[in-house]
Amino acid sequence: TENTGGGGGGSGAGSASKGGSGVVIIRYPDTFYANIGTGVTAETVNLNNGFRYTRFTAGTGTFSLTTTIPAFTVEYLVVAGGGGGGANGGGGGAGGLLTGTNSSLQLNASYNITIGAGGTGASYPGRSSITSGSSSTFSSITSTGGGRGGTEANNWGNGTAVGATGGSGGGGGYLNGSGGNGAGGPGTIGQGNSGAAATTSNTPDYGGGGGAGAAATNKNGGIGALNSITGTSTYYAGGGGGGLQYSGTAGTGGLGGGGNGSSIEGASSAGTVNTGGGGGGTGGGNGTSAAGGSGIVILRIPNFYTATFSAGLTMTANTTAAVGSRIYSVTAGTGTVTFSLA
């Protein structure tokens, strides 16, 4: 078994088993704090009896003890919900993305968290129900929901072909009977980028939604932003792909959870849950456009501290992904978080 040092089993005619990897566990009074160097996988656990321990499970590095409590800082990633894709229209814009470090938060105080929902999609007859994504919040930091994709509009009403403004803007849709095609919506500075305009041709492409990393390019959704707060580099907030009026290849969603668009009568794909990706738009006919992906809030704090979350929030904790840190991924709900010494 891994991290037990157990010997592997022998064999007869078959293959023998390997031995388990080793482990190092160091126990010390809780008046001391661990400094853990890079290159090792470790977690620190408070025993609540006057002692804590650090358990090392892989790698090579350094370890020392100090009586100085490290400064309390919170690294954060706040991604809003992506916009819904347009019917006969453009891809939804990605949810706004904000990331950084906050050193001004206080221990034993409560801070609000809200995870934004993705915007809704619809078929062409129900196009008025297509919506932009909802905002995500951590403390005073708010990311704006992605703009909905532009939806077929005509001279006699119903729908708007211009992509909506959002964290990233939605892609433009079809102006039936009016000539031309809809413009992409603008993104919010510092959070995302603009959606693309629809193109005018014999087989119109509808615009892709903007992404957190780049604006949309024609029918394809903009790429999301790469972030490594969890210890693994991951794309978030990709724009949704735009629809295609007739048969052929519709727009693809941007890296970071953007949904693909569809051609005539097809169903597009939704933005990926907890990425803030925009939903894909549809082509002509009565195909159904897709919802945007929900947002996420990820918090990373030194492992000398801990976080407590209220009811109403769905949260996953990880104390081993990054040395010396506790990482909390909040994936749904509304509530509060309180920080304290571990």
Feature-to-residue mapping (PLM):
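Low-complexity, glycine/proline-biased repetitive segments and flexible coils/loops
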Residues: 1-342
